């Protein structure tokens, strides 16, 4: 049997290659062992996003857990997002949540994510405990889901109703609906579509139907994957005020303004800090990962807020939210995963989108104007990224150079260096470049921040030429 390893956000593999019924049984059995070892009366919420064969793998997981005496709350809905599983875990008081999803990976993949009782990612320590108990083979006498329902070990629950009610209790949905603004939503054929249809039945929808192959495209809300949606907004000639995008399991966000300009996570984080502190009067800790814009620190300084920078990965943010003992306000990462106070300690693309739309509706200001409000405090900026495909030997040589200290890249003089997770080299005028190796492939991720997109790419080109010479 193949060795199963969990990555930073669950176990993912190609369907019918390593992601098979037999391997899902192995992982579910190890999950059951972990649950029984750590909880007196263990229970779990189980569901799946719209990926191919998701319901089958969710049923397999359900029956394995039930066969071990674990109570399973099985999502009865077809379009289940990761945040819906996390919310359901908290609301039912379950020991854990399990969702069959490969998030934004290409359509050939599926995956298995474990959520903790507090409604966020399970800790690396807990994941290691599950992983270490995955058997080479597993032989179980499994009954049907219906049999386990009859025995009281499986209970179907409506996570869609639960999520919609939670959203309606925390947002002024009528204010967004009746604002006179037109909205658009690209579901990328993913799990956010049903709750968005229920909350906003009259907005413009794209890729919001059942397509388990995602029309052949990875459901990742990055600009190059969103050209059809971008054109839809541009062709509306300002009639659409904002466009929201979520990924396959709806925990990551993409956003557009009314001119069809992509608004990245760096800007979204700043907008949330601005909205929550200046408009809603909230206070609390701000958490951002190492690859996020330095403007977060600048805005926090202006507002008297504390910003803690973490290693890259939402699990580090979740750990601070859950365990720091401090009042939390907002936290997020460059890749589109953002969490806010008043919800679960989990990334949630739909939730963050609703916050931005509510900000627009209640302020009567365009997204472009709200971004300008941020620029008025911290200055204009752009963060861009190159992925450099290099040999492992070259990658290690570059990392060794970074560890030894760098005085300059081309004519760019380094004034300060940080190495929390990768290497960030600061230049004059608050610009910087960050170099970080991928842990899974011979790729170097190189980020740059400058006052404009053109200047950021200029820095990237200079650094790239210096690194590859």
Regions found by a protein language model. Give the residues of each.
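Short glycine-centered, acidic/aromatic-flanked micro-motifs in structured strand/loop junctions
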Residues: 47-50, 185-187, 257, 342, ...
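Buried hydrophobic positions in well-ordered alpha/beta secondary-structure cores of metabolic enzymes
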Residues: 9, 46, 85, 98, ...
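Proline/glycine-rich low-complexity loops and linkers
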Residues: 77-79, 132-164, 258-332, 338-339
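Phosphate-binding and adjacent anionic-ligand microenvironments
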Residues: 240, 282-469
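Gly/Ser/Thr-enriched, mixed-charge loops and adjacent short helices
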Residues: 1, 110-237
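Glycine-rich phosphate-binding loop of actin/hexokinase-like ATP-binding domains
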Residues: 98, 103, 111-130, 251-278, ...
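An N-terminal, well-structured beta->alpha segment
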Residues: 1-68, 95, 152-183
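N-terminal small/polar loop signature for handling phosphorylated ligands or for N-terminal nucleophile
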Residues: 33, 43-110, 198-256
């Amino acid at each position: 049997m193949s060795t199963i390893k969990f990555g930073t956000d669950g176990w993912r593999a190609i369907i019918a290659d390593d992601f098979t019924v037999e391997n899902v049984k192995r992982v579910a059995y190890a999950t059951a062992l972990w649950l029984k070892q750590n909880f007196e009366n263990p229970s779990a919420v189980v569901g799946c996003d719209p990926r191919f064969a998701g319901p089958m793998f969710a049923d397999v997981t359900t029956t394995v857990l039930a066969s071990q005496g674990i109570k399973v709350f099985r999502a009865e809905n077809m379009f289940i997002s990761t945040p819906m599983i996390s919310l359901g875990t908290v609301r039912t008081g379950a020991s854990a949540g399990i969702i069959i999803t490969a998030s934004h990976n290409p359509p050939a993949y599926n995956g298995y994510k474990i959520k903790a009782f507090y409604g966020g990612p399970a800790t690396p320590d807990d994941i290691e405990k599950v992983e270490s108990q995955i058997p080479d083979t597993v032989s179980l006498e499994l009954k049907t889901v219906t049999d386990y329902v009859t025995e009281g070990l499986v209970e179907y629950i409506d996570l869609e109703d639960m999520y919609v009610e939670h959203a309606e209790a925390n947002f002024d949905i009528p204010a967004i609906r009746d604002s006179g603004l037109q909205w658009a939503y690209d579901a990328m054929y993913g799990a956010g579509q049903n709750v968005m249809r229920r909350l906003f039945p009259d907005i413009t929808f794209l890729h919001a139907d059942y397509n388990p192959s995602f029309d052949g495209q990875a459901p990742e809300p990055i600009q190059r994957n969103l050209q059809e949606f971008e054109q839809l907004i541009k062709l509306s000639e300002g009639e659409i005020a904002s466009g929201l995008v979520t990924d396959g399991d709806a925990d990551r966000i993409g956003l557009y303004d009314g001119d069809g300009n992509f608004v990245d996570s760096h800007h979204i984080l700043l907008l949330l800090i601005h909205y929550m502190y200046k408009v809603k009067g909230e206070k609390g800790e701000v958490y951002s990962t190492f690859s996020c814009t330095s403007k977060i620190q600048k805005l926090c300084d202006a507002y008297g807020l504390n910003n803690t920078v973490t290693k890259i990965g939402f699990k580090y943010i979740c750990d601070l939210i859950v365990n720091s003992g401090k009042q939390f306000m907002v936290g997020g990462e460059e890749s589109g995963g953002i969490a806010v106070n008043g919800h679960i300690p989990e990334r949630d693309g739909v939730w963050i989108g609703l916050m931005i739309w509510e900000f627009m509706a209640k302020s009567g200001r365009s997204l472009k104007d709200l971004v300008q409000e941020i620029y008025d405090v911290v200055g204009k900026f752009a963060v861009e990224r190159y992925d450099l495909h290099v040999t492992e030997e070259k990658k290690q040589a570059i990392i060794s150079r970074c560890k030894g200290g760098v005085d300059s890249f081309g004519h760019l003089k380094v004034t300060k260096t940080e190495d929390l997770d990768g290497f960030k080299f600061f230049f004059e005028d608050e610009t910087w470049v960050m170099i970080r190796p991928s842990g899974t492939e011979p790729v170097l991720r190189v980020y740059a921040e400058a006052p404009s997109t053109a200047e950021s790419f200029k820095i990237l080109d200079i650094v790239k030429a210096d690194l590859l010479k």
